């Protein structure tokens, strides 16, 4: 198949959506498909001739994000030369909507992965109940224009149905490169331990992700403060707009000597961070799938998390990790319980790594391939937003 990925979020950005796109792109290529990516154009050189960049500007509220032009002559030139079989969008914004029009003009299926629960992120613009309801309505109206939706978790599928989405939804989580996370470079691991100030007898918890308000890292800091373990350390791998606040909070709580902010970690450094830790700590309730949880489990880490539907697809409470109510005291008790019992922690670690195999990128890419095949076989052209239509043939 010739597949077009249309996304407003792509490299060099670092987030779960980009990780998902890159993993599926490579896995689909390895399965013999051609994958074209249409994405914003920050200062970044691509080594792939099948990546087409749209002009873009930094988003005023989050400079690392991009606002793309809704039109590209270069994209049209490529699309004229390439007969796509299917359009797969990863954002409902400028480039995603461009892809919607491409699908309409070429009368091919338009599949969309609903990566982000947008009503949970309106605080970056203007947080009110009205804006949340508006985000729900716009999400529903957009999804209703699609041939089908891919939900990365049962949580997302439930939300979409509750908002009134009626098109077919298939639950396909982003796969994990289990082979990559199962082995580690000892030299890189030792260097990262030194950078983090991790002492030999310390018990390390790891959080990996963007440091935004919605990730709830504040709760992890407060849980460390409540912990009774004298040798506990929280490793924070990531960066973002909330970092300065979190560093000041750690100082205010008097735990700066037990928290290591390591910035964004990529490649072997990210793998090394997972292998440095004894458990993975997670407190976000806005995730659509918690991709980092799968990565942690693939590296052999048990997970300690607050209750959330996105977590339940990965973590089996009492077997691959501990799931607690969303209070700092409860998280702290779970930290102490698991990190204070090494035989139990080791058993959880083995079970976690075994379970991660069921979420391998190879298995998930096969499921995505089947989704595409079904979408193509059953496709009937759908009417899209008239105001978004580009000049072209009518459906």
Segments predicted by a language model, with ranges:
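N-terminal subdomain of nucleotide-sugar transferases
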Residues: 1-55, 366, 373, 384, ...
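Short alpha-helical donor nucleotide-sugar binding micro-motif in glycosyltransferases
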Residues: 79, 143, 264-265, 272-277
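Short acidic/histidine- and often glycine-rich active-site loop of Leloir-type glycosyltransferases
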Residues: 121, 171, 308-318, 322-323
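A short helix/loop element that forms part of the nucleotide-sugar donor recognition site in Leloir-type
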Residues: 182-198
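Conserved donor-binding/catalytic core segment of Leloir-type glycosyltransferases
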Residues: 193, 198-224
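Aromatic "clamp/platform" in nucleotide-sugar-dependent glycosyltransferases that forms part
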Residues: 285
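Short hydrophobic beta-strand element within catalytic cores of glycosyltransferases
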Residues: 302-305
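Conserved acidic donor-binding segment of nucleotide-sugar-dependent glycosyltransferases
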Residues: 317-318, 322-328, 337-343
